[in-house]
Each structure stands twice: as C-alpha cells, then as structure tokens.
Amino acid sequence: KRQTVYDWHTASFKGRNSYSKTDPDATFMHMKEDHLQNAQLKPGYNVQIGVDSEYIVATDIYQDRNDVWTLVPFLKNIEEKLGFRYPSVTADSGYESEEGYSFLRENKQKAYINPKTYRQWKKRSFKNDISKRENMLYDKEKDVYTCFAGKKLTAKYIKKQKSKSGYESQITVYESEGCSKCPYREKCAKTRENKQLYVSKGLIEKRDESYQNILSETGIKYRMNRSIQVEGAFGVLKNDYNFKRFLLRGKTKVKIEILLLCLGYNINKLHSKIQGERTQSYLFQLKQA
C-alpha cells in the first residue's frame, strides 16, 4: 500500500522536481508577493503572453519555472493558433538560449533578444574582470584566446551538451599553456588547474547577431514597446484587475481562466483605444532628443 502511494507521487512529478498536493499540475515557484518583492516558494504556473499592438494575441501556461524553456513551444503555439508567423520576436534576457536562436533562424524570424550578460557588460566591474572571455583577445583564424598575462588559450576538445528539450549544442573547451607562476592567477583562475574557458561558438555567433539587432533604431523601438506593452499588460492584470491567484485548479481550467482574463483585457484595451482615437496605433514611437 505504501509503495502504491509512493508510485503515485512519483508519477505526479511528470519530470518536475516538485508539485502541489492541492493542485498536482502546479509547480512550486518563487513568488514575489510581499512589499519588498522577496521570493516566497508557492505552487503556481508560469504564464506567458504575446502582445501585438497592445493586444494580448496569445497566452499559455507552463509548469516549468524557467522562461527559457517556454520560448520555442510558445512560438509554435502562436503560429498554430494564429495561422501565420511573426517576422520578428522581441523578448528579454530570460528567454535567451542557443536553441531559441536556432529556432528563430530556421523559421526566418529576426531575434531581438537581450543577451543574459547585457547588463553586466555595462558594469565597470565586468569590464575590469580579466577572467571573463569577453575581456580576452581572440584570434578567429587561429581559434586562440590571449589572456591578460599574454598567455594563449587553445582549443583542447569539443564536448556535446544536450538540453532538457533534447537540443544538442557543442561546447569548445580552451585551456591556457600554464598558470602556475602567473602573477594574475588569483584574479583569473579559480582552481589550481590551468585556466579553462567553456565556449559555445554557436551561441556567441547568434547572440552577437541579436545584440546588433537590439542596438539598431528598430531594435530600440521594439525593446521599448516590449517594456510598455508586455510588462504593462502584466501590470494591468496584476494591479489594476487585482489578479493575484488563480481560482481554479488543474492546468486545463487554469488556462481557461487566464484566457478569459486576457479576453477582458483586450476588450478594455479596444474601448480605451477607440476613446482615445488610437485604433490605428501599433507601436509607441521613440521620443526625439
């Protein structure tokens, strides 16, 4: 009897590392609910929305707390439901992955995704960190990095890495020629071994392309509109509508609940745009300095 109970609990995980007894479909996630935005562990769903011209055009819920694994299935869901494919996709750094970039490239969709290290790149501490790959010289022809001390880091081997979705990426491992007597060792190498770099060339190449996209005038406009339209929609749902928790239980019922909520949001948005004579407005424009 006890083994039967254990087997039932194990089956309820469905590939996750947690679930709620009151709603087996829900996964424990960090919720920022108090006034200090402190993380509290509670059962919930990862709600994703896609916004176009200030309207929520797609929404879905996921049991994975990490946004990065929701991008590809969400884009597939949008195309299936709407019957067409958007030419570009704008998202924040939480959605960045080599798999996501590859999917967008294969589908001929332009990526406007912030790199995960985008904010760090701007910090002085990051720019002065000699251990970072970004602060080393790279010879593309010879495929060699040169560290702050002038030592060469050459490619030793390539290892394959598979994500939880099954996507396989190649990681090139670089190693320095000797760090034992280097005067900068404490600032660079964190182990007693020689300095190593684990580099995904595929990710770097696609990340650089996306980075150039977000720096363009169009990219700046899209990122601004993502902040206004997507974050604004979540703000209205959570604060203006005071929607703090789902009333129903189970993934199917919760999805119906969020769909109804988004439908109400879109009706209010349409009314607001009609009142403001903004029905032909699609993107907020950048202010001229």
What are these language model-derived features?
Residues 1-289:
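Anion-binding and metal-coordination hotspots
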